[in-house]
Each structure stands twice: as structure tokens, then as C-alpha cells.
Amino acid sequence: MSSYANHQALAGLTLGKSTDYRDTYDASLLQGVPRSLNRDPLGLKADNLPFHGTDIWTLYELSWLNAKGLPQVAVGHVELDYTSVNLIESKSFKLYLNSFNQTRFNNWDEVRQTLERDLSTCAQGKVSVALYRLDELEGQPIGHFNGTCIDDQDITIDNYEFTTDYLENATSGEKVVEETLVSHLLKSNCLITHQPDWGSIQIQYRGRQIDREKLLRYLVSFRHHNEFHEQCVERIFNDLLRFCQPEKLSVYARYTRRGGLDINPWRSNSDFVPSTTRLVRQ
């Protein structure tokens, strides 16, 4: 269990509790979680973070009424900056989006501006929102993470408790390599409910070569670990930077959707540009 799982900042969350669904607009449904909860134990300070990045959300269940009462549907794309004070708690995000269902808006841009304003207020940081009509996305191909998949290794694993031990002495040689490694075996669990979160992860780095077996064992050790998606990605970035000391590092995870939302955080200390096309499990 994470050291902050019982922190008072989490006590008021609707996550893990029985809730009523509202279908008329209510911005108060949104709830934030301080990023400092997991950053402080990692020694990460807001004024000296070793990375930049965003939390990319895809909104698949977004609907409202136009001025004449005709339902509208869209797919939303949200990017929440890493410098925001809070991350957005996903169940509250779902409940908030449901509150649009029977609410009339004059036009699509009013919806976009409302989302951007409310999310920025909750996160206490920069948020950008784009809305797409369905015909804009139809025929869009399934994407994939570029890189070498490290999953098909003939190894025995019997420990699924999180540990950084596997990353000790995980680099070899003095030669500097530049490579991208991919795993689809990332599984962590919700900090509050302990429900499973399934993801694929892409690790791009420049530095001494990282042992792929040790890296895979480390990633598999998240299997019983309880943390939010964004927190896991920052933990992985921080651990790799600390133990493997690459010159450049980017960590990008795309998680499967839950409640009509998927969360795709990335962190980097280089000029990394993430692909935003959904993966096969999304």
C-alpha cells in the first residue's frame, strides 16, 4: 500500500463510495488530488521537477443538449499540464461529465470552454480541451507503441510486490545507447478501490543499456501496487532516472478506459512528442 493511501486529502473523495448520478450541469462534482502526495515521498519538489509532460485524457462518453434540446455527442481530448497542483480524480470526472447529459448549451465551443474552465479550476493549472465529431475520427487506425517489446522473455516470476531492487545494477557497459522499449504487461491498482488498472508503457532513453529482464521484473512488480495512473508513471520515471541515470528519458503509459475515460500520462526530460492514437486495448 502507498504510504499516503490514508491521507486526509483523500478522505472526501467520492471514489469507492456509493453516489447519485446527476444529469444537469454541476462543476462541484469535480475533485482533485494533490500531486504532492506522491511527489513528496519521491523527493520531487514543484519548483525543481526533473521532467515535463501532460496527463492526456480521452472522453468517450460525452453528451449534452443543444439550444433546441437535441442531444449532441463528441469525443473529447484533454491535456492536463504536469505543473498543475492537482490531478483530476477519474470517478469525479465521470460524474461531472454525466452532469452535461440533460444540460443545454448554445454551441460546441461553449461546452469546450466550460470543460476547460472547470478542469483548470479543479486542477489549479493549465488544461486544454478539444472536441471531435464522430465523423472526424471514423476510420482512424489503431495505433501502436514504436519500440522493442520486452514481454516475450522466458523467465520465471514469483514476486508481484513493488520493489526497486531489480533496478540496482540494471545497466551494463560504458557504451551509450539510444533505444525505445515497450511493455504491455503493466498492471497497477487504484489507490482507493484497488481495482485493476491495465496499461501499456513506452520507455525511451539515451544512456548505458538497461537490462531488459530486470526492467520487466520491475514493471511486473507494480502488479499489486496501489497508485493512480499519473503517480505510477512519475514513480517509474523517477526510479529509472535514479538507478539507471540515463542522459535522456521519456516514460509514456496508455491505460485502458474505465467509465468512458482513458488516462495516458507521459513524463520526459527531452523533446519527446507522444503519439495520441489509441492502442488496441483502448
UniProtKB/Swiss-Prot annotation:
One of its GO terms (biological process) is queuosine biosynthetic process. NADPH binds at S90, K91, R258, G259. The active site is at C190 (thioimide intermediate), D197 (proton donor). It is found in: Cytoplasm. Coiled coil: none annotated. Its main location: cytoplasm. The keyword Mitochondrion does not apply. Keywords: Cytoplasm, NADP, Oxidoreductase, Queuosine biosynthesis. GO terms for molecular function: preQ1 synthase activity. Homodimer. Catalyzes the NADPH-dependent reduction of 7-cyano-7-deazaguanine (preQ0) to 7-aminomethyl-7-deazaguanine (preQ1). Belongs to the GTP cyclohydrolase I family. QueF type 2 subfamily. This is NADPH-dependent 7-cyano-7-deazaguanine reductase. It comes from Escherichia coli O1:K1 / APEC.
